[in-house]
From Swiss-Prot:
This is Adipolin. Insulin-sensitizing adipocyte-secreted protein (adipokine) that regulates glucose metabolism in liver and adipose tissue. One of its GO terms (biological process) is regulation of D-glucose import. Residues 103-118 have a biased composition (Pro residues). Residues 40-49 have a biased composition (Polar residues). The gene is c1qtnf12. It comes from Xenopus tropicalis (Western clawed frog). It is found in: Secreted.
């Protein structure tokens, strides 16, 4: 055991002595340098002979200040902190470099299409018209509340059309189409009002409004305006042709009159002669009449011949409101 102790003491002393020698050698080198001594720069060019002579001197004179292996190891151990610091610096630089971002990459491929959506609501013409009316009403109310409408103006106000006139097709409020239900005999020199009509059973006929009275054959206007009326009256005059010779003044008149006053009010009138070779002929009358609320129109047949005539069933009477 004592031998080991003495061995450790000897090793420690040797280390201390070597350190002292190294320090002494460094001091001697510092003292041996002359501050006024001139040294040539390292890159001064020499001749070949001078270079060989200098290299021989360097090889012959060993440098007393060259450290041994132990001194080199101590110097390396003393610089371990510098290595750690350099690693820290490198780590800091790496972090800074990692903070930089490159340009964005190209867009990826398009994904698959999604599922189809729910079917939209069916929008009809009536719904669109109702929405437009509501929007127009709200805009008018906002303008009235904001006071943008001037109180006095010298110009005439613009004509404001109703919303129904803005639509491409106008609804027919008043109109009818009816036919005579049975035959009507008109005696000679007699004016008769046609009555007892009926609606056609076939598709295509129409009746709008409540102004038509089928029993009396009269149409009463519930809206003032201009109406268009037409009538197709089928007349059978076979009895006249068989009994007597026709006279030039023998004719038949078909009229559409207002309030049954064909001479006081404007009426629609057609005069047809009885010289036709056919047994039945048709008299057609058509035109426009202006009616006020409560006024009615009807068909009259005036027979000026010397024998009775017969108005056939199926004769038409039609009318429609054209405008106010």
């Amino acid at each position: 055991m004592r031998c080991w102790v003495w061995l450790l003491v000897a090793i420690v002393l040797c280390q201390q002595l070597s350190v002292v020698r190294v320090l002494a050698a460094k001091k001697e080198r510092k003292k041996g340098k002359d501050p006024h001594q001139f040294t040539e720069p390292f890159n001064v060019s020499l001749s070949n002979s001078e270079e060989l002579h200098e290299t021989d001197k360097l090889s012959e004179t060993p440098d007393p200040g060259l450290p041994d292996a132990y001194t080199t190891w101590l110097g390396f151990v003393g610089r371990t902190d510098d290595g750690a610091n350099s690693k820290k610096k490198c780590k800091g630089k790496d972090k800074k470099l990692r903070g930089l971002f490159g340009p964005p990459g190209p867009p990826g491929p398009q994904g698959p299409p999604g599922p189809p959506g729910m079917p939209g609501a069916e929008v009809t013409y009536e719904v669109l018209l109702q929405d437009f009316k509501q929007m127009l009403k709200e805009a008018t109310e906002r303008r009235l509340m904001s006071g943008d409408i001037p109180e006095h103006t010298s110009e005439l106000p613009p004509i404001v059309l109703p919303v129904e006139d803005l639509s491409p097709y106008r609804r027919v409020d008043e109109g009818f189409h009816c036919r005579l239900k049975g035959q009507v005999i008109v005696d000679k020199k007699t004016l008769v009002e046609l009555q007892n009509f009926q609606m056609p059973t076939a598709k295509g006929s129409f009746l709008r409004g409540s102004g038509l009275n089928l029993a009396t054959g009269r149409f009463t206007a519930s809206v003032p305006g201009i109406y268009q009326f037409s009538a197709h009256v089928h007349i059978d005059h076979s009895e006249i042709k068989s009994k007597a010779q026709l006279r030039p003044r023998d004719n038949v008149r078909v009229l559409i009159c207002i309030e049954s006053m064909c001479h006081r009010y404007t009426s629609l009138e057609v005069i047809a002669g009885l010289e036709s070779n056919s047994k039945i002929f048709t008299v057609h009358v058509q035109g426009l009449l202006q009616l006020q609320v409560g006024q009615y129109t009807s068909i009259f047949v005036d027979n000026s011949a010397g024998a009775p005539i017969t108005v056939q069933n199926g004769s038409d009477f039609m009318g429609i409101l054209m405008g106010l």
